[in-house]
């Protein structure tokens, strides 16, 4: 989702106050009785537990963002203000070959990015509920979602997931019911599992020491999909847990804890 989105031929919801501010990487919840459908630009989707949920991409440009829904036979809109958010800077030192890529490695990364991009456009019936289940039990403190990474002194793209330090071999668990959309060995992500949960929600589990599922296999919430490792570009054993919802890079903490979701009136 690049740039601000404006919806035409719709009147603002009566009683709307000043637009609430939201941060990139969050999820906005707009609840009311009688919601029939939700929309954002040309995308339409079904309400979840009586509310519309709008994921805000980590790189969503600051500015007004207009949300819409159909409720009791009428179309309603509201506006939120996507603000600038200063995520922390993370400095890492890694082997040179993992930062300054050879022609072959660069071609591999580009191919893997294309393979992942196809997953972000998947659509199907919703198979999950909120909050999601933790991918580790117990779940350690995570961090660094959205951090601006400086690797070997060179600025790199923001971190689009959350890293959880855990012992090598610790079980990694599916966050919700779904289908294994892809299993891969990636240059950056190492051994990785991607699970499609429907409604455009895909969770990813990276740097695994082993993979316990196969592509096309159904998985249940809390089922083991692999084990913590340090494969790919990693400084030590940890789980990189990422979430894409309708293409947007979302902070996993938002979907693991309902208190983190930003509710608007």
Regions found by a protein language model. Give the residues of each.
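Conserved, short, structured surface segments that act as functional micro-motifs
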Residues: 192-197, 201, 217-265
């Amino acid at each position: 989702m690049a740039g601000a989105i404006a919806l035409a031929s719709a009147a603002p919801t009566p009683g709307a106050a000043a637009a609430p501010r939201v941060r990139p990487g969050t999820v906005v919840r707009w609840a009311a009785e009688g919601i029939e459908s939700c929309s954002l630009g040309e995308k339409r989707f079904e309400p979840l537990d009586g509310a519309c949920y709008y994921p805000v991409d980590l790189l969503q440009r600051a500015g007004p963002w207009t949300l819409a829904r159909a409720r009791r036979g009428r179309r309603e809109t509201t506006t939120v203000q996507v603000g600038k958010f200063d995520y922390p800077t993370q400095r890492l030192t890694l082997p040179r070959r993992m930062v300054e890529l050879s022609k072959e490695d660069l071609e591999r990364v580009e191919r893997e990015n294309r393979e992942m991009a196809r997953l972000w456009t998947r659509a199907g019936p919703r198979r999950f509920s909120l909050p999601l289940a933790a991918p580790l039990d117990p779940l350690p403190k995570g961090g660094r979602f959205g951090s601006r990474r400086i690797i070997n002194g060179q600025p790199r793209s923001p971190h689009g997931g959350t890293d959880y330090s855990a012992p090598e071999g610790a079980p990694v668990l599916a966050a919700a019911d779904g289908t294994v959309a892809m299993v891969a060995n990636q240059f950056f992500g190492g051994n990785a599992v991607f699970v499609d949960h429907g409604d455009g929600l895909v969770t990813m589990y990276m740097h695994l020491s082993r993979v316990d599922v196969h592509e096309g296999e159904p998985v249940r919430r809390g089922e083991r999909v692999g084990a913590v490792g340090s494969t790919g570009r990693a400084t030590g054993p940890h789980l990189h847990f990422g979430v894409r919802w309708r293409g947007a890079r979302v902070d996993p903490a938002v979907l693991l804890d309902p208190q983190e979701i930003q509710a608007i009136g």
